[in-house]
Amino acid sequence: MEKWNKHIPEGMKDILFKESNIKLNIEDQLRKVYKYSGFSEIISPTIEFYDVFNSNIQAIPQEKMYKLFDNLGRVLVLRPDMIAPIGRITGTKMKECTYPLRLCYTANIFRVNEKLNGKRGEIAQSGIEIIGTNGIKSDVDSIVTAINALLSLGLKNFKIELGEAGFFQALTENMEIKEENLKKLKEIIRNKNYVALKKFLDEISSKYSKEDFELIKNLPKLFGDIKIIEKAKALTKNKKALRSLDDIHNIYKSIENIGLEAYISIDLGMVQNIDYYTGVIFKGYVEEVGDSILSGGRYDNLIQHFGIELPATGFAINVDDIMIALKKQNTMSMDKDKKVLIFYKEEFLRKAYDFMQELKMKKIICELSLLDDDKEILLYSKKKGIDFIIGFMGEEKLFVKDLKSDKIAFLKKDEIENLLML
């Protein structure tokens, strides 16, 4: 029988050294953006009861969840998203809090990928949720925070596409169409397959207004700049659909007033499989990654499943895809802190240790050498990316080697500190 002790499960990944450092830097930067935008971080358990995610509007199908059992036979899951846990926490622990709540998180989620197409089963996510207000101000706040988060990472040439969940719902609510056909219709529209859409609409037996039919037929083409809104309005008299279009227009205008409209485009063909979102929906894209790197929107019906009715909006960033995009754009964020290796004669251990602690307090990465041979120390330092080797070999000045310039000097401690702070 084959042993699997040297393998990891499909969809999982070891993250090592440089890549790990980049991932942590990205997550730290996102945390700073959230913190200075007034969001408070929460941490939820990796394992939740299946019932947390078992509702008729859950965005994640149950077959996509990793399941296990506790000692009482109750079904548990590795959390497949963070929105439901935040809903649970809000409904059970935050009823007396001051609203609106501004929450943020950075966590791994887990989803089964049966297609084995290279997608991860463990996904690093980072995002925010604004809970307790249903005006467009909170939608704008969420979208603007998403834009600023991506900008803070140095990401180039990204776009946030805006849609509206209520728009498609308004166009189809009076159609007599089977559930499986509606699901197929949504898929065709998402794929922007105009030919297949026309054929599908001609074949199904439904009652719909001529205007709504024409608008649905044109949904794959209705994406681009803000002018798309007026084009769509000209194709329908559906009052609910027109209200949805007005919402998108007003959100866009607010973002335009802030000066961030260059990052926004409109996609009225953005539809969802399950009626999870209730208002504006948005996704972030960059050329270097095929899938969306960010997704979010308004979901006003979820938190009521946890004992309290509250509107909410937010987004989640896929940190793994952000890493791919930054790597391809050659804008990876690395630690710029200087790295120092200190070697010493045994009688100078205490002085070497004390100096190392002083350097650490100044945010200099520093370690004591575990090697004694000069050649081994030099080879280790070069492979590790050390900037300076410092040697405690006598009472007065210390040996200092700059590995970038290959220069050697003998300096006092204060002179070394000044050098490292440059």
Swiss-Prot record:
Compartmental location: Cytoplasm
Any one GO CC term of the record: cytoplasm
Pathway participation: Amino-acid biosynthesis; L-histidine biosynthesis; L-histidine from 5-phospho-alpha-D-ribose 1-diphosphate: step 1/9
Keywords from the named record: Amino-acid biosynthesis, Cytoplasm, Histidine biosynthesis
Record CDD domains: HisRS-like_core
Superkingdom in the source lineage: Bacteria
GO biological process annotation, one example: L-histidine biosynthetic process
Pfam families (alphabetical): tRNA-synt_His (PF13393)
Residues annotated as signal peptide: none
GO MF terms held by the record: catalytic activity, acting on a protein; histidine-tRNA ligase activity; transferase activity
Principal location: cytoplasm
Assembly: Heteromultimer composed of HisG and HisZ subunits.
Family that this chain belongs to: Belongs to the class-II aminoacyl-tRNA synthetase family. HisZ subfamily.
More details: This function is generally fulfilled by the C-terminal part of HisG, which is missing in some bacteria such as this one.
Role: Required for the first step of histidine biosynthesis. May allow the feedback regulation of ATP phosphoribosyltransferase activity by histidine.
UniProt protein name: ATP phosphoribosyltransferase regulatory subunit
Organism: Clostridium botulinum (strain Okra / Type B1)
